[in-house]
């Protein structure tokens, strides 16, 4: 019945996992390493621990817009926000907006920790952790090892699903917040 079906016909196209050498980062992020993250988070035993990444628009001549994606580790619930660019200020602005909508208490309860990669958009550790209301931290940020996307596997799979709808090279200029 499936005489002409091959691995290339599948969504992952028969790709194999390759092993990479660990590369030392040019600069160490100020936040905590993923190695310091409690084991309960690693085992996905507790809810409300998130992974965060950004999805780029077209590189050549496209708009600077990006998607900021957040994936909850236990339920795999996804949140997606359209940012005007890939700056640290845009990431902090999305977190500020979320905290204002939810309230400081609810934000702290829902977003207990956020694990990010070492991208330039996530280097403002102070901005991402400081609360807009009152004092103290709104969340705790953990940084993955460089070139180790598998440490945020749920988020990377969610980004792969986005790329099925919006392939690489697509310009996000015509996309609005309502479209997300």
Residue locations for each model-derived region?
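Short helix-terminating capping/connector loops at secondary-structure junctions
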Residues: 105-110, 136-138
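Active-site beta-loop-alpha junctions of metal-dependent nucleic acid enzymes
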Residues: 63, 80-105
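Mobile-element integrase/transposase regions
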Residues: 6-67
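Mobile genetic element proteins and their domesticated derivatives, centered on retroelements
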Residues: 53, 76, 95, 114-117, ...
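Short small-residue beta-strand/loop micro-motif enriched in glycine and branched aliphatics
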Residues: 76-81, 168
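RNase H-like two-metal-ion nuclease catalytic core shared by retroviral integrases
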Residues: 116-118, 123-126, 132, 141-164, ...
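Major-groove recognition helix of helix-turn-helix-like DNA-binding domains
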Residues: 1-5
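Short, acidic, Ser/Thr-enriched surface-loop or helix-capping motifs
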Residues: 72-73
């Amino acid at each position: 019945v499936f005489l002409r079906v091959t691995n290339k016909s599948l969504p992952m196209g028969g790709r194999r996992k390759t092993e990479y050498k660990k590369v030392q980062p040019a600069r160490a992020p100020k936040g905590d390493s993923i190695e310091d993250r409690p084991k309960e988070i690693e085992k996905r035993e507790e809810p409300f621990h998130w992974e965060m990444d950004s999805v780029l628009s077209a590189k050549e001549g496209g708009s600077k817009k990006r998607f900021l994606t957040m994936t909850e580790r236990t339920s795999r619930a996804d949140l997606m926000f359209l940012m005007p660019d890939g700056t640290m200020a845009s990431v902090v602005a999305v977190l500020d907006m979320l905290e204002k909508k939810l309230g400081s208490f609810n934000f702290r309860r829902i977003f207990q920790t956020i694990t990010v990669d070492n991208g330039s958009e996530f280097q403002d550790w102070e901005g991402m952790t400081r609360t807009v209301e009152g004092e103290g931290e709104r969340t705790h940020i953990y940084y993955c090892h460089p070139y180790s996307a598998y440490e945020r596997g749920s988020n990377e799979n969610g980004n792969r699903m986005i790329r099925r709808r919006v392939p690489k090279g697509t310009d996000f200029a015509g996309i609005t917040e309502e479209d997300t």
